[in-house]
Amino acid sequence: MNGIPMEHGLLLAAILFCIGLCGLLIRRNLLFILMSIEIMMNASALAFVVAGSRWAQADGQIMYILVISLAAAEASIGLALLLLLYRRYHTLNVDTVSEMRG
């Protein structure tokens, strides 16, 4: 058995990326923006793994490890900024914080 076809995996990655992009553009809450970025990064990691498995190369898995480590760094920095934003302004709305700046 070959497993799933490459087109199905790439279609799933594209759908996940579009969901993350819509969440990034529509939502104004910083927590949901961070979650949308994580969805987009996981979609790109899925595309790397699917493409790597199609040609039986380990490059896709190596890129997956890189994307996951970048996602972990982004999540830690993003959550630190989220805590700082909430402690200072008592809101997670990005538009409210940009208006408060003056």
Swiss-Prot record:
Enzyme class (EC, first level): translocase
Molecular function in Gene Ontology: NADH:ubiquinone reductase (non-electrogenic) activity; quinone binding
Highest taxon of source: Bacteria
Membrane topology: Multi-pass membrane protein
GO CC annotation: NADH dehydrogenase complex; plasma membrane
One Pfam family named in its UniProt record: Oxidored_q2
Primary location: membrane
EC number: 7.1.1.-
Reactions catalysed according to its record: a quinone + NADH + 5 H(+)(in) = a quinol + NAD(+) + 4 H(+)(out)
Job description of the protein: NDH-1 shuttles electrons from NADH, via FMN and iron-sulfur (Fe-S) centers, to quinones in the respiratory chain. The immediate electron acceptor for the enzyme in this species is believed to be ubiquinone. Couples the redox reaction to proton translocation (for every two electrons transferred, four hydrogen ions are translocated across the cytoplasmic membrane), and thus conserves the redox energy in a proton gradient.
Family per record: Belongs to the complex I subunit 4L family.
Subunit structure: NDH-1 is composed of 14 different subunits. Subunits NuoA, H, J, K, L, M, N constitute the membrane sector of the complex.
Name assigned to this protein: NADH-quinone oxidoreductase subunit K
Organism: Aeromonas salmonicida (strain A449)
